[in-house]
């Protein structure tokens, strides 16, 4: 699938292992993984950060193979679901950073253009999440209140 605002094709991706079974050397079982996710989620970590920690520290390649559920689903069942989805959160964070940069550098025309592109992606993603009922139907991105969302 191609990039939205760039000429690149974006074809490289990570390869998942063919076997979907848990490796024999893994010492954690499904309950231990769930407890680790709960503990890390209470610290305020995002699902991708939790996955990185589980991969690097505990040797869990895919939580779904061990537990049968993805990290976000486990967090939802425990009640630690983030208010806004992670990808939307990071895009809002990027827009806030660009806006802060533009306050100091008013003549940065390319920065202004990139802000428009990022905000259009935010609106598109928000529309998708509203149709999937992840965000409430009255949720709206406003640049004036965006810094409070990512604070």
Curated annotation (Swiss-Prot):
Disulfide bonds: none annotated. GO terms for cellular component: cytoplasm; cytosolic ribosome; cytosolic small ribosomal subunit; nucleolus; small-subunit processome. One of its GO terms (biological process) is cytoplasmic translation. The keyword Phosphoprotein does not apply. Pfam families: Ribosomal_S13_N, Ribosomal_S15. It is found in: Cytoplasm; Nucleus, Nucleolus. Belongs to the universal ribosomal protein uS15 family. NCBIfam families: PRK08561.1 (NF006331). Component of the small ribosomal subunit. Part of the small subunit (SSU) processome, composed of more than 70 proteins and the RNA chaperone small nucleolar RNA (snoRNA) U3. HAMAP family: Ribosomal_uS15_A. PANTHER family: RIBOSOMAL PROTEIN S15P/S13E, SMALL RIBOSOMAL SUBUNIT PROTEIN US15. This is Small ribosomal subunit protein uS15.
